[in-house]
Regions:
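Non-catalytic, conserved peripheral segments adjacent to functional cores
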Residues: 6-117, 137, 144-187
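Conserved metal-binding segment of the jelly-roll/cupin
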Residues: 113-136
């Protein structure tokens, strides 16, 4: 049940072409001081059929434009959902559907997240995630539904032809691990 005034603080969930992946916009209450916006609300997630849980929050700071991180996921039983947002700079954020029973298996969705647009991307369990920074000094915040389990950490290569992800800028910095994932074979 909403309280009076809650309407000005909604999170607006936009469906994407991938089931369970949502682009999230915040509704701002602005005045002379600046603004107020709700960035997390369990009821808002539940109203979209999502079961929110925050087990861990992470921050990724990226010195240079063209830094690519990903494309990562955790294998069962440690699969994770995440909400990704940019708190400084901007990035091109990618969700890749790796759920074999999904109608969008091996398809991807991308969205530009920035400190200016304050959008977020919800990525469900079974989808991989990666991003490319579009500005120097880009900071990314993640709310994760599961703790990090190194033994369950997996990834697919950012330029694997099995997916055809189109990145909007040159990849200049990438870890050896992310660069060396083998060609994808069905899960």
């Amino acid at each position: 049940m909403r309280r009076a005034g809650d309407r000005k603080h909604r999170m607006i969930f936009h469906k994407t072409g991938i089931p369970g992946v949502f682009a999230i916009e915040l509704e701002f209450n602005r005045d002379a001081r600046g603004f107020f916006a709700r960035s997390w609300c369990e009821n808002e997630f539940r109203s979209h059929g999502l079961t929110p849980r925050i087990a861990q929050c992470n921050i990724s700071f990226n010195e240079r434009r063209g830094t690519l991180r990903g494309v990562h996921y955790q294998s069962p039983p440690w699969q994770e959902a995440k909400v990704v947002r940019c708190t400084k700079g901007s990035l091109y954020d990618v969700a890749l559907d790796l759920r074999p029973d999904s109608p969008t298996y091996r398809q991807w969705f991308a969205l530009t997240l920035s400190a200016a647009n304050r959008r977020a991307l919800y990525i469900p369990e079974g989808c991989a995630h990666g991003f490319l920074t579009l500005e120097d000094q880009t900071e990314v915040s993640y709310e994760m539904s599961e703790f990090y389990h190194p033994e369950a950490g997996r990834g697919v290569r950012w330029n694997d032809p099995a997916f055809g992800i189109v990145w909007p800028a040159e990849v200049k910095i990438i870890s050896d691990r992310d660069r060396s994932y083998p060609d994808f074979v069905s899960l």
